[in-house]
Amino acid sequence: MFKKFCLLIFLCFLNFIIYAQNITQIIKPKINGHTSFAIFVDDKTFSKISESILEYKKSIEEKKLPCYIIVGKWVLPDEIRSEIIKLYNNKPKLEGVVFIGDIPIAMIREAQHYTSAFKMDQKKFPFIRSSVPSDRFYDDFDLHFKFLNKDSTDELLYYYTLLPSSSPIIEKEIYSARIKPTLKGEEKYQQIEKFLKKVIRIKKEKNPLDKFLYGCAEGYVSNSHDAFISEVLSYFESFPKTKEQNGLFY
């Protein structure tokens, strides 16, 4: 029993060392705050456009939100999830993350009950078609996964099965987003950099939201106009300028 316990401790320590080795750089916040934010980026993207990413970090901290930059040679999504949970348990507590560049994508099996319209026979169709790509892998800590394998053609796709011990509903501990390029080769770095510069510029503008376009899929709430009334009122309450300008469209 004691030997098994020692082996378990050793394996956990070994995983920690491996994960730590894949993190090539951590840039800590320059300000203090009640919560924090983190930018996760692959090392190649950071080496190409580090100046713009640092400026993006600066623009976030100008809004009084402490910001980390975590750079790594990511091998598994688990590495990133582990680091996110560690930041969440630290002070100031992590409130959100953004993934920039080539960040691994978790392709989840046995998770179709979390989706609204994705229904496919997992036994009949190949993994790449019948798995659910989801960043809930990173931002919902009550979901538990078992690693299956890596995709044979797309180096960013990693397959996991959702374990029965997972929560039956989605309740994210943090928010997350991706800045993922659509172009290939060197052009993808230029595309990310262009977007970051646009975000930095917009953050400096004083431009209150006065027009709001709302849309939904065909058949949503059975196309009932009455069902939309409360939603419209909530948008007017959340975005008062739209009411003044008659700027809500749906």
Locate predicted features.
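Bacterial Sec-dependent N-terminal signal peptides
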Residues: M1-I23
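Cysteine-dependent hydrolase recognition
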Residues: Q21-Y250
